[in-house]
Amino acid sequence: MLRRLFLALIGVGALLSESARGDDSPPYSMVLLTENFPPFNMAVDGKNFAQESNIDGIAADVVREMFRRADIGYSMTLRFPWDRVYKLALEKPGYGVFSTTRLPEREKLFKWVGPVGSYDWVMLSRSDNPIALTSLEQAKAYRIGAYKGDAIGERLTTMGLNPILMLRDRDNIRKLASGQIDLWAVGDPVWRYLAKLEGVNGFKTALRFNSAELYLALNKSTPDEIVARLQKNLDQMRAEGWVDAARSRYQ
């Protein structure tokens, strides 16, 4: 009799323990993936893998605060290459990826929260190169380097400019500096950070041809309530000036 009572008490204790652990944890958690895309998201040590507090940048700071306010659990990992992390977020429930451009052709692939940043699309040339462009049509006469899987490279490919796509955008710095390409299609201010990391200067803007906003893209299975809660908190952060303050920390 006493043994049965003892076992029953153990069972009740286990149930209470499980309940307490559940109450202490956020009811929903996500796996967030990103890449080196300064100043929006980047590894503190500049390498191609980082986790949690070793990831820096405007968007990384904004996303962390947004999830904290929304009381949604998350892990954050920076990996390489970009098309791999993009594919994981596209295919795996509970995953998200940032920072990515919200293009019309991507609209129905994800659920979106943002914007978490904005940037310009530019064509760079060497400062000693007399290239001067007034349209993308003129750029077709030149060798253009771009980043594989990036919105800029995708758009130029669609337009028939046939950019040479690199797995690492930083490789385009070397190629432009050495004359292997004539133009580098890249984001501004992204290129300024990458060039500084490589210790290279001597580039100029040959054409500024678009502006775009950056988002957190969530797997389509993400509950609408989670998306709405994140967006509500981001909107509140923007109204408070929190997002502008985050941007100013990296200028």
Segments the model singles out, each with a brief description of its role:
Residues 23-101, 108-109, 146:
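Extracytoplasmic small-molecule ligand-binding "clamshell" domains
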Residues 34-37, 119-122, 194-231:
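Periplasmic-binding protein-like
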Residues 38, 52-65, 126-160, 165-167, ...:
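Bilobed "Venus flytrap"/periplasmic-binding protein-like clamshell domains
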Residues 57-69, 216-250:
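Extended ligand-binding regions for polar small-molecule ligands
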Residues 68-69, 78-79, 83-95, 111, ...:
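Short helices/loops that flank or line small-molecule/ion binding pockets
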Residues 73, 151-167, 235-251:
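Ligand-binding clefts/hinges and TM-proximal coupling segments of bilobed small-molecule sensing domains
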Residues 77-138, 149, 205-207:
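Acidic, polar ligand-binding/catalytic clefts
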Residues 90, 100-108, 182-210:
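A ligand-binding cleft/hinge motif common to bilobed small-molecule-binding domains
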